[in-house]
């Protein structure tokens, strides 16, 4: 039995999956954002409850909005203040008496897609989230790749390529990022970036959904903005694909619902890739909000 926990800023979602990777239990509880001891106790209590229900000790995986320090094991997270700087994996292991896997929520999202029935034989899957922020996860042979310092897949904090900067024009905005740097992809390719760029070029605040609606209605500014953004995506994605050469790319987050992306990227990408490179298959993520808990559970599949 595989147990997954998607630990968010307001709730913890639990899911249990059997050996066929079918979900057999679901539960949601509020996140203890201020009391770390209660946070650990809540997770441990759910584990004990479902161990008793299924009569086995489930393998435990946690997905978090942050990362674990590769040297110390301390958590780096801002969405769950109680867990910041704490040793959640180690403390939970001590409490339940078994090993626990932990990874960031973007890797869990990617892992969930990689273990979809249709994709599970793909040698490599890249998950990219175009939501409030922009981030990603890298899956090789069914396992999340976290890297030496546990920052592999933090694609949102790679910088805008120089050709993307030129594409944005003479008055291109140098956008700041929450990480303290400027020019991070997170600030440009996210839904937030989509809106910020529109406001920069047209002097008007609009929500992404309204820009997309205006584009469908033929609004001149929206059409120009979407065309510019699609080319920006193609340039930046080509940069990432040249580095990692994934077989499949699964897109999640609010902007992934913009169907034009799946028409435009395959047409625009080739001119930005090496001549010998192939455009990977680009699909919309299938598992939506359940991706985090699925991926957390599947951290243990290859053990």
UniProtKB/Swiss-Prot annotation:
Gene Ontology MF term list: ATP binding; N-acetylglucosamine kinase activity; zinc ion binding
GO biological process entries: N-acetylglucosamine metabolic process; peptidoglycan turnover
Family classification: Belongs to the ROK (NagC/XylR) family. NagK subfamily.
Organism: Aliivibrio fischeri (strain MJ11) (Vibrio fischeri)
Catalysed transformations (reactions): N-acetyl-D-glucosamine + ATP = N-acetyl-D-glucosamine 6-phosphate + ADP + H(+)
Keyword Ligase assigned: no
Assigned keywords, A-Z: ATP-binding, Carbohydrate metabolism, Kinase, Metal-binding, Nucleotide-binding, Transferase, Zinc
Residue positions binding ATP: 4-11, 133-140
Transit peptide is among the record's keywords: no
Name of this chain's protein: N-acetyl-D-glucosamine kinase
SUPFAM superfamilies in the cross-refs: Actin-like ATPase domain
Function according to Swiss-Prot or TrEMBL: Catalyzes the phosphorylation of N-acetyl-D-glucosamine (GlcNAc) derived from cell-wall degradation, yielding GlcNAc-6-P.
PROSITE patterns referenced in this protein's UniProt entry, alphabetically: ROK
UniProt-annotated binding residues for Zn(2+): 157, 177, 179, 184
NCBIfam families: PRK13310.1
UniProt pathway annotation: Cell wall biogenesis; peptidoglycan recycling
EC number: 2.7.1.59
Classification via InterPro entries: ATPase_NBD, N-acetyl-D-glucosamine_kinase, ROK, ROK_cs
């Amino acid at each position: 039995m595989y147990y997954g926990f998607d630990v968010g800023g307001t709730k913890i979602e639990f899911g249990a999956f059997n050996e066929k990777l079918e979900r057999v239990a679901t539960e949601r509880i509020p996140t203890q954002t201020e009391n770390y001891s209660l946070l650990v106790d809540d997770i441990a209590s759910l584990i004990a409850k479902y161990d008793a229900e299924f009569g086995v000790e489930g393998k435990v995986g946690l997905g978090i909005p942050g990362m674990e320090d590769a040297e110390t094991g301390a958590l780096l997270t801002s969405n769950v203040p109680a867990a910041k700087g704490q040793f959640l994996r180690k403390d939970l292991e001590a409490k339940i008496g078994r090993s626990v896997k932990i990874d960031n929520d973007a890797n869990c999202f990617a892992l969930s897609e990689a273990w979809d029935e249709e994709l599970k034989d793909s040698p490599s899957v890249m998950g990219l989230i175009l939501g409030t922020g922009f981030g990603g996860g890298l899956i090789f042979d069914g396992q999340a790749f976290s890297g030496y310092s546990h920052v592999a897949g933090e694609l949102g904090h790679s910088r805008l390529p120089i050709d993307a900067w030129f594409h944005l024009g003479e008055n291109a905005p140098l956008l700041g990022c929450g990480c303290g740097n400027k020019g991070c992809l997170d600030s440009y390719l996210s839904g937030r970036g989509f809106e910020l760029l529109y406001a920069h070029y047209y002097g008007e605040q609009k929500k992404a959904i309204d820009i997309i609606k205006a584009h469908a209605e033929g609004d001149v500014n929206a059409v120009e903005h979407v065309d510019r953004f699609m080319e920006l995506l193609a340039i930046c994605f080509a940069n990432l694909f040249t580095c990692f050469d994934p077989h499949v790319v699964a897109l999640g987050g609010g902007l992934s619902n913009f169907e034009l992306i799946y028409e435009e990227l395959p047409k625009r990408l080739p001119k930005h890739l090496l001549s010998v490179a192939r455009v990977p298959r680009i699909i919309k993520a299938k598992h939506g909000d359940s991706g985090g808990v699925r991926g957390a559970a599947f951290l243990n599949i290859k053990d």
